[in-house]
């Protein structure tokens, strides 16, 4: 059971909200979160790097000069890895880096990572109505009132993206906007401050506690 203060648009405390997310045991928490993080970063790799071996490089079928009598080092092909323009020894080939992790484990890692950031979590009431039109300056000022300085890396978690909020947020350099049902371990751990709306918190409990 975790308790957090709820703030309004002006940055004033207007109440408390209690939520419960099942997390990993203390002895295994770091391990499972680390596994989820490694999986996410590894699966993001394209795996498309490719080089040609001496067998795949065009040309080089003819021996460039005779074996003996020239005074030069012997050579069998102009596509030897020792030659400029030759094949690559043990170079990269396209491969699949995907790591598998059970869905239950992934969700457990997400919940554990989220709860581990409780000290940096800022819970706010819905504020889309406070922005009558897209205004980045107003949103930056709100973050400052909530205790999240614009210079720090901020993760803003919303249940949905109202147009005024999205347009106001997209030009803030260190801000990342994410939907409550699209959480990932890297963003949760990478942010300095995590700002969550009350409806987004309810969505997180609904989606990830199952």
UniProtKB/Swiss-Prot annotation:
GO terms for molecular function: rRNA binding; structural constituent of ribosome. Belongs to the universal ribosomal protein uL4 family. The keyword rRNA-binding applies. One of its GO terms (biological process) is translation. This is Large ribosomal subunit protein uL4. Residues 60-71 have a biased composition (Basic residues). One of the primary rRNA binding proteins, this protein initially binds near the 5'-end of the 23S rRNA. It is important during the early stages of 50S assembly. It makes multiple contacts with different domains of the 23S rRNA in the assembled 50S subunit and ribosome. Forms part of the polypeptide exit tunnel. Signal peptide: none annotated. Part of the 50S ribosomal subunit. Residues 41-52 have a biased composition (Polar residues). It holds the Pfam family Ribosomal_L4. NCBIfam families: rplD_bact. One of its GO terms (cellular component) is ribonucleoprotein complex. Disulfide bonds: none annotated. Keywords: Ribonucleoprotein, Ribosomal protein, RNA-binding, rRNA-binding. InterPro entries: Ribosomal_uL4, Ribosomal_uL4-like, Ribosomal_uL4_dom_sf. Residues 41-71 are annotated as: Disordered.
